[in-house]
From Swiss-Prot:
Probably functions as a stopper that is part of the head-tail connector and that locks the viral DNA in the capsid. During assembly, functions as a docking platform which the preassembled tail can bind to. Plays a role in morphogenesis of the virion capsid after genome packaging. Keywords: Viral capsid assembly, Viral genome ejection through host cell envelope, Viral long flexible tail ejection system, Viral penetration into host cytoplasm, Viral release from host cell, Virion, Virus entry into host cell. Coiled coil: none annotated. Belongs to the skunalikevirus head completion protein 2 family. One of its GO terms (biological process) is symbiont genome ejection through host cell envelope, long flexible tail mechanism. GO terms for cellular component: virion component. It is found in: Virion. The keyword Secreted does not apply. This is Probable head completion protein 2. Its main location: virion. It comes from Lactococcus phage p2.
């Protein structure tokens, strides 16, 4: 799936049965939660000028069941699907990671 901006992608996530979408990290991870972090930017350079065209986000999904429907739903809006990272003994959750590239929105910021 292609999205025009972070807000477009975020609004799509809000249609899914997630408990929360968090930009950043928390001390504890929770079931059916997506954690986002900015990982890189796509920059175009010409002469002495450069333009940020978009951003890459690292996405982490935490779920109780390995076959939770969210694994497929959120995986469909990522660049290359999921990698199963680990099973957390502390939280008893499966953690999946993936990446999504989103072009800059109208304002040009990573969260627009």
């Amino acid at each position: 799936m292609e999205f025009d901006s972070y807000i477009d992608w975020y609004n799509n996530l809000l249609t899914m049965p997630l408990n929360d979408v968090i930009l950043g990290v928390k001390d504890t991870i929770e079931d059916k939660t997506v954690y986002l972090s900015l990982s890189d930017s796509k920059v175009i350079k010409m002469d002495n000028t450069s333009f940020v065209m978009g951003y890459y986000y690292q996405v982490v999904l935490s779920v109780k069941d390995v076959d939770d429907e969210l694994v497929g739903l959120v995986g469909n809006v990522l660049q290359n699907g999921w990698n199963m990272t680990n099973w957390s003994e502390n939280s008893h959750l499966y953690n999946y990671t993936g990446t999504v590239y989103l072009p800059c929105g109208a304002g040009g910021q990573a969260w627009q």
